[in-house]
Amino acid sequence: MSIQSILRKETLKKKDKNIDLQENNINDLVVSASRVIAPLWPISTFAAHHPWMGLEKQSFERVANWLKEARNVDIYPSASMIHSAKAKGEIEESFLQMALSRWLDSQSFHIPRKKVEQFCQAALKLEELPSSLLSSPQLNKLAEEMSYINTESMKDSFLQPVSSFIENQKGENLSDILNYHIIKWCKLYLDDSGSSWTMPNREQGLYRAWHHLIKFDPALSKTERKVLKDWPEDALIALTKALSELGISESNMQAYLEGHLLSLPGWAGMVRWRSQQSIEEQELLIEYLAVRLSMELAVVKPYLPLKNQKVEKKVSIVPLIASWIYWGDISTREWLQMSATEQSELLAFAYRFDENIRKKLWLEAWEQTHAEQLKKKISSKQRATNDKKRVVAQLAFCIDVRSEPFRRHLEKLGPFETFGIAGFFGLPIATTELGSNDSHPSLPVILKPKHQIKELTDENECKSYEQRKMVGSSVRYTFKTMKQNVLTSMLLPEVSGPLLGLQMVTRSFVPRRVGGFIRNLRKNMLQKPDTTFSLNHVHDTNCEIPIGFTKEEKVNYVRQALKMVGLTEGFAPLVVMCGHSSQSTNNPYAAALECGACGGAAGGFNARVFATLCNLPEVREALSAEGIKIPDDTIFAAAEHKTTVDELEWIYVPELSETAQEAFDCIEAIMPNVSQHANRERLMQLPNFKTKIKNPSKEAHRFAEDWSEIRPEWGLARNASFIIGQRELTQDCDLEGRAFLHNYDWKQDERGDILANIIAGPGTVAQWINLQYYASTVAPHYYGSGNKTTQTVTAGLGVMQGNASDLLPGLPWQSVMQSDRETYHSPLRLLIVIQAPTKYIEHLLNNDFTFREKVQNGWVRLASVDPEGRWKNW
């Protein structure tokens, strides 16, 4: 504990002796409460995350029940989604019956099994109880006569913010007014777009800046400003005082703070992310809560004290009786003839077999159907691993699900072998591109960079390039400054109108031609020179992390990646490391379509660095001494897979050997054909195309350049599985672009370390992506971001609906929905399939407690395929 924390703690004790902070101080409570929200990255570096990452110690079912009761957020698929999936053959009835039987076997009840099964079968149709039945006088009279039934065990109580209980004279809920104020202050403080007018005293932190300004806020009444007139200047003291004056007992503090964090999970998530980025803002979440609760006290103080701040959800027996009448064929006469014990037993069972349980069983059946279909695909394509065709080139792609169709068509049309690996290629680097002073952590967000890699060129070439780049930057800066200035903003439409009007017309009616022209013009004007990298280790005191790698680190990273995919022998003349990137116009979510393993950036930089390392003589010599012999005529190159147009762009091609040149020419010859096939398959999934596409590549480019296009590609929608194993396991299988594919050879992993690293790194990234798509599909109003066409990009951070909503944390409607009524993404929890002997899986689960917890608590599903091809569900 720091000296400042100790002094602050002592001050707190002197200020308010009613609150004992000896063990559970506010700092600890805020940290514990923050588990209910996930960090939210800025939209420019949209990083995959799932909203329940802090809740994985609890079961998925328990979190689902808690969210339903406490926030009325349903995280199971809706009835319409389930019915649609069943109609499309995605759910087999037999698996639903198996799930029901398992659940019934786990329950204790004294009702005839046949009667229970009849009730459950009818309830599982997911039909709403008729309103005529629920409101019928007969039913309500029966419920009155059964009022002696004890339902205390069915009650739940939840602590809610005080403001949520109160309405003002205009009928406005005070929590909505509070949210309005908090959104305003968050936008001011967190603004990352370089506004001309910034928040005064921003450098002192959120709370102090707010404290200086709140006394002048015209949106507050005199009474409200009076409450805050002599308010503490320290955030922690203010938070403690607010909790005390709101009447929150110490035992309820964490739950109360959780309620406030969940009120605006987007803004709170952004605050949490910022608090993790620098020491200066490490207490930002405390400051946020201090501002929020201080404002709440000011708003609600005239209404205090309240009699009860807990929401008690007393169970009505009316719908429970109605459910047995409608689904169990028990008449009102039969109810009256039962004993109180029998009545209680039926009501208790109906209460347990609620909507969440019914949807849970459907979800399990849906997931089991998918697993069975995947199992059949894999087993039908089993082949001997030693019967390999001769390959002229090997290409390593990111595990991203969009790589799967491209790899499949590439292998089908030529003598090529492909591999799957995390798109950062195991390089924990921060990248600095030529002419830039900013670095980007080009690795999964769960990791921290260990090396800084800079793009370099000749000094004169660099100056010339920077000057050309400065011209474009100056134009953008001037436009932005004019737009944000009070006077020049009125002149700007007159000056820029004709040019922007022309751009609007041409971009709308001939997007492919205009987009291509602008892209080529930009490329020709910049004329980026040939570059190298700062690969050799340099300790720069101005950098937090060292520049480049030592010789040992170079060898280690190359060895690690090659072993991870099982490529330690049988090298082809040409080995291509393929990063990936997306291409879209006027798209705030562009980063969401980039490489998740590279922190929301294109993966080409990492691919090029890795290929360069593999070509270094000192690296090859060291690997050869360890038994990894790369032939002299084998050359490593780098390319970038453009997922929106399914093209391969070469970004690093060193001098090639004769055999490598032949392989390169072979790839170039068949690539247009590969792109045509991959584009046709992908475009046919989009809602715009239901008929034959004459020129798939042309259409794909139109989508990429059309600035009115709300869905340039599906991204990672419909992802459902992560397959870890040799390519032979899935080769020739049409996995429909739904599987993350990571190469793995258990025979080269005696201790299981490689498998553990795959699960801890790429496995976690895949799980986060999967649950982000899941959450945005099942609860779009809470975890998604609504319709793209009505979004407002705010403060350079993210999007809102209008100008006073929560910062929307998830994916837009267009990323997961086919139409207003039909989903495209299937909300299934990720199925991880590992090709390895059973003992490897047992070793993994015994040694990786975090992963075992995820499997046991239902956050991921796990299956394995042993060397004999036997499938096992864990």
Swiss-Prot record:
State where the protein is found. Cell membrane
Q: Which UniProt keywords apply?
A: Cell membrane, Membrane, Metal-binding, Transport, Zinc
Q: Which GO terms describe its cellular component?
A: plasma membrane
A Pfam family assignment: DabA
Q: Look up the domain of life of the source.
A: Bacteria
InterPro entries found in the cross-reference section: DabA
Q: Where is the signal peptide?
A: none
Q: What topology in the membrane does the UniProt record assign? A: Peripheral membrane protein
Cofactors:
Zn(2+)
Annotated GO molecular function terms are:
zinc ion binding
Per UniProt, Zn(2+) binds at: 398, 400, 580, 595
Q: Which family does it belong to?
A: Belongs to the inorganic carbon transporter (TC 9.A.2) DabA family.
Q: What does this protein do?
A: Part of an energy-coupled inorganic carbon pump.
Its subunit composition reads:
Forms a complex with DabB.
**This chain belongs to which protein, by name?**
Probable inorganic carbon transporter subunit DabA
Q: Which organism is it from?
A: Bacillus cereus (strain 03BB102)
